[in-house]
Amino acid sequence: MQISSLTCALKTMRSGCLFLGLLLSVMSVHAHDAISADARKAYLSRLDELAKTAQGNAPAAIRANAWLETGKTLDEIRALLNEDIISHGKTQGLETSVLVNMLNASVHKLHLSPQTRLYLSDPRPYREALALDPRGKQASLARFLLFKYHFYDSFVDHPLKPIKQSKESLLEMIGFGENLLPLSDPGIDSEEVHFILGIHYLQALDSAALPKAKCQARVAEIVKKFRSQWPSSLKLATLEALSSP
């Protein structure tokens, strides 16, 4: 796979994370507004109710789930905003502007990547969920979403050139990926986990964050898994291109 094709493939995968936002915008709002008045009110009301639960006196599992749902809600909003930016170069519409301003005035301040000019996922809700109930039934999904969004927010065009990713952060993400691999959960995309974990091992190889032999062995195992389970996957082609000498 040529570099130009690889870059296109990675942008396609990143855009795939925004597909839900595109569907929501097509189905539920006016032609030029990513977010309607009703959607804005519903989002803010939901975030307010979730905050009351997350910061209340409910059992840890219930508060953890509220944090998880907060993260999912914020990422749903983020997908809509980013789809607007991708389509029009900026967010559009009065209600969208009102929602962005209200979020920025709250604890849910939005952060725009200076490199991609897209809104970044907020890891805090997922980390709060894991801190409250690390072995609960919502923990695996929180870990997966943190793992997934960290990856797609971490680079511009080339995943082996991450933006300011520390060794500690890389090793944490590898640990998350290894923890997620054996799980069978409808909310966790196994192909995505294998792909991102493979890329992280290639990053660890490039940065010498882990022994060379270990990184090469794990990448080979992941590629072998792809060839047997997802042989026509674009992710397999990307892994093969990135791992070739």
Predicted regions and their residues:
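Intrinsically disordered, low-complexity peptide-like regions
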Residues: M1, S28-A31
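Bacterial N-terminal signal peptides that target proteins for export
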Residues: I3-C17
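Bacterial N-terminal signal peptides
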Residues: G16-V26
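Acidic, polar-rich low-complexity tracts and alpha-helical solenoid repeat scaffolds
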Residues: H30-P245
